[in-house]
Design a protein with these regions (language model features):
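Intrinsic low-complexity, intrinsically disordered segments enriched in polar/basic residues
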Residues: 2-4, 25, 147, 154
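Conserved acidic-Pro-Pro-aromatic motif
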Residues: 47, 108-111, 117-210
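Detector for methionine-enriched segments
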Residues: 1, 8, 85, 100, ...
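N-terminal start-of-chain detector that recognizes signal peptides
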Residues: 4-6, 16-20, 43, 106-109, ...
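SAM cofactor-binding core of SAM-dependent methyltransferases
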Residues: 17-113, 120, 141-143
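Alpha-helical protein-protein interaction elements
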Residues: 7-9, 54, 88, 178
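Non-catalytic N-terminal targeting/anchoring module and adjacent flexible stem/linker
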Residues: 1-14, 210
Length: 210
């Protein structure tokens, strides 16, 4: 198995039992999320950037199939319409708008952010509305020195993390996301080539020593 195909792995020994559950879409993330759901029993799932679910598995599709309330956001109209046809029990919205989260019990939720661009700023908007049990946020770690710190004049640094460079959306690197989300009370428990998985700190004892 090449590095680009390696499964999601736990970041610390105390979470190493999760490695045995790394299976399924995309690099084993779904299997680890399923293991976490067995511990935390979420009552809500939110996927922002759910267009992959048009033809590929939804990351949290296993919870939708179990009847857990699911809210999907997909900006692309064609993909959105396809989701409405194939995921009929989900609540489906277009562009992400944090106001759509009003009234939802985020404290009992799993949230996935996968928009190929402004992932961290969107994740932060979610965190300002509530504190999910689990958050998985897409990252991008292949900047290279030519991209530097990515802080152009006139733009707040956090929004720079989604700018286009040569037509490619620059996403926050994993270390940057981990540093920023720590302030909200989360710990990185596992990481794949493209996703970082975080758990709310008060729930960590549930995962230790398993």
């Amino acid at each position: 198995m090449t590095d680009t195909q390696s499964p999601m792995v736990a970041t610390e020994l105390r979470f190493a039992w999760l490695n045995d559950r790394a299976d399924g879409w995309q690099f084993g993330e779904t299997g680890i999320l399923e293991a976490l759901s067995e511990r935390f029993d979420p009552g809500l799932t939110v996927e922002i950037g759910a267009g992959d679910g048009q033809s590929l598995p939804l990351t949290l599709g296993f919870l939708l199939e179990k009847g857990v309330k699911t809210v999907l956001f997909e900006a692309d109209e064609l993909r959105q319409n396809a989701l409405k046809m194939t995921r009929k029990t989900a609540v489906i919205h277009g562009f992400f708008d944090a106001r759509m989260l009003d009234g939802l019990e985020l404290s009992q939720s799993f949230v996935v952010v996968d928009v190929d661009g402004q992932d961290w700023p969107i994740a932060e908007e979610v965190l300002r509305c509530g504190k999910p049990q689990v958050m998985m946020i897409e990252h991008y770690d292949e900047f290279g020195p030519r991209y530097g710190r990515c802080e152009p004049e006139g733009l707040p640094p956090r929004w720079c993390l989604g700018l286009l460079v040569d037509g490619f959306p620059i996403q926050a690197p994993a270390k940057e996301i981990e540093k920023r989300i720590r302030w909200y009370g989360y710990t990185l428990i596992a990481k794949s080539r493209v996703n970082s998985l975080f758990v709310r700190n008060d729930l960590l004892p549930t995962l230790e020593g398993c």
